Amino acid sequence: MLTERQQRLYDSFYESTHDNEYLDQKTEVLVGLSAAIAMSCDPCVRYYLVQAKKEKIPKGAISEVIAKVMAVSAGQKRLQVDEVIDQHGICLDSYDE
């Protein structure tokens, strides 16, 4: 658990992320949604989906965000496995013999 002071500081930081200088409201919601999905934060995903509806963000934009998170995640996993294969000198072609 956070101390009261830590919680106040966190709350202040979190609130500051909604006071954007460069991102418009719709972009902020889509960035938040993508981060929430990537971090597997179910309450956060729900929050940003509710915000997306309030901002009238179309289903297509939400679908594109979900697809982008999926693509980055899949790419990261592929690179992770490639790195293990390279580090340990594993030849997958030999598995067909």
Question: Where would I find each of the regions flagged by the language model?
Answer:
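Hydrophobic alpha-helical segments
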Residues: 1-97
